Amino acid sequence: GQTEACGQVFHWSEGDTFVLPAGGEAIHSSDTHAGLYWVHDAPLLRYLGVSTVKPVFEPCFYSHQDARAQLDAIASNPRGANANRVSVLLGNNAFPQTRTVTHTLWAMLGILPAGQVQRPHRHQSIALDFAVACQPGCYTMIGTELDENGMIRNGHREDWAAGAAFVTPPGYWHSHHNESGADAYVLPIQDAGLHTYLRTLDIAFSNRGRADLSHTP
């Protein structure tokens, strides 16, 4: 497919990501049936009672093929064996401090290898998680408390489905599980750009074997 916006034309295929600034029109077209997962700032603007004045960044395109190549390289590196997450962070040169795709939104492409668990973590940004590819047996546990082993107590289970999205609420612990026989890929999009700017992200990770917390600086 392709998108015409801001005087540019973007040619895209399955898994590609692009961001467009406010204002102007975007015309999307495709020779075959296509679905776009669209996340935008309208709820925030509506809550504040404001409208956009000017664009604050240029359009940016992220190739899924390039991101997957980088992700595979990271996943095969032994240094990542003990990492809480294995992912490629999508960035924009306009936002070097927040390391986000827009001034408000953060995105990354992550892999959850077959048979692995991404241990509980939490943050004050809300996460809109898009399941890029997965098999039955992939799910997320969500809850407010940890047990003595640092896992979620009495959590809610949200099963993944390829092409579907789920929400992890702000401040809730969540862990990702892959009990299938195939690697899974997920694209979380968060309002972490806004929280990073306000210094309110407050991300924390559970420690293995105990319920106290490890905070990032």
Predicted regions and their residues:
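Active-site proximal loops enriched in glycine and acidic residues that flank catalytic Cys/His/Asp
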Residues: 124, 132, 142-144, 169-172, ...
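Double-stranded beta-helix
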Residues: 31-80, 177-217
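A short glycine-rich, His/Asp/Glu-containing loop-to-beta-strand
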Residues: 82-127
